[in-house]
């Protein structure tokens, strides 16, 4: 995922990856992580996801990282949240009492920002990367997370040749092969969601599975 590609998607508002509702797997499985209310939760490539509002409603401190400035601004305006903006190194920091979003490149995000994080949530980050860049992102995510951090990973899998991503197909095999060095992995669920995704139906994608994993940083 090149920065120019991502910025153009947001500029043209071609954001079919943005969900209008809170992710059902997040609602169903988040409590399984057993986190106290004041937990700091890292959300990589957060966009303007409503899932961050859900996490804040659980009492968590949400720390997001997003490349595109418009996405960050729309998150606060769409949810009618007053925010303060400051500059932190190469990143712009937008924050309210419970939500802090760092606008900029996740590969240059200082580790000091996530040093107190004990949980993370990845629904749209791993699947945003083409396979050629995905492993690099996975290593960067691991490097930002303190040992013992727990998280919920949500992926999509489908025949990649049937559709040009993003979102890109991430198979259970890929997850095991590329994440198991840094994380303990537990499969929570895997289900057919093709009927709920008209874009995939329109492109004649034959099947579409959404999976949820519980990850623990080693």
Swiss-Prot record:
HAMAP family: Thiopur_methtran (MF_00812)
Keyword S-adenosyl-L-methionine carried by entry: yes
Any single GO BP term: response to metal ion
Gene3D superfamilies hit by this protein: Vaccinia Virus protein VP39
SS bonds (residue pairs): none
Single GO MF annotation: thiopurine S-methyltransferase activity
Presence of keyword Nucleus: no
Protein name per the record: Thiopurine S-methyltransferase
EC number of this enzyme: 2.1.1.67
Subcellular location, principal: cytoplasm
A GO-annotated cellular component: cytoplasm
Catalyzed reactions per annotation: S-adenosyl-L-methionine + a thiopurine = S-adenosyl-L-homocysteine + a thiopurine S-methylether
Keywords: Cytoplasm, Methyltransferase, S-adenosyl-L-methionine, Transferase
Positions that bind S-adenosyl-L-methionine: 10, 45, 66, 123
Family matches, as InterPro entries: SAM-dependent_MTases_sf, Thiopur_S-MeTfrase_Se/Te_detox, Thiopurine_S-MeTrfase, TPMT
Source taxon at top rank: Bacteria
Record family assignment: Belongs to the class I-like SAM-binding methyltransferase superfamily. TPMT family.
Compartment list: Cytoplasm
């Amino acid at each position: 995922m090149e920065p120019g590609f991502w910025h153009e998607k947001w500029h043209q508002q071609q954001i079919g990856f943005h969900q209008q509702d809170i992710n059902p797997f997040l609602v169903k499985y988040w409590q399984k992580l057993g986190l106290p209310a004041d937990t700091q939760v890292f959300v990589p490539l957060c966009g303007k996801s409503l899932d961050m509002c859900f996490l804040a409603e659980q009492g968590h401190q949400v720390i997001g990282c997003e490349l595109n400035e418009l996405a960050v601004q729309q998150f606060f305006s769409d949810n009618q949240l007053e925010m303060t903006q400051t500059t932190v190194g190469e990143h712009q920091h937008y924050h309210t009492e419970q939500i802090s979003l760092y606008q900029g490149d996740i590969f240059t995000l200082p580790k000091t920002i996530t040093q107190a994080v004990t949980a993370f949530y990845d629904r749209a980050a791993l699947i945003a990367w083409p396979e050629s860049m995905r492993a690099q992102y996975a290593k960067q995510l691991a490097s930002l997370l303190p040992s013992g951090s727990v998280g919920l990973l949500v992926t999509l899998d489908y025949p990649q040749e049937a559709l040009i991503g993003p979102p890109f197909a991430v198979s259970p095999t890929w997850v095991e092969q590329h994440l198991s060095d840094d994380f303990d992995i537990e499969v929570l669920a895997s289900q057919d969601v093709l009927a709920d995704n008209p874009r995939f139906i329109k492109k004649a994608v034959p099947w579409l599975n959404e999976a949820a994993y519980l990850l623990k940083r080693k």
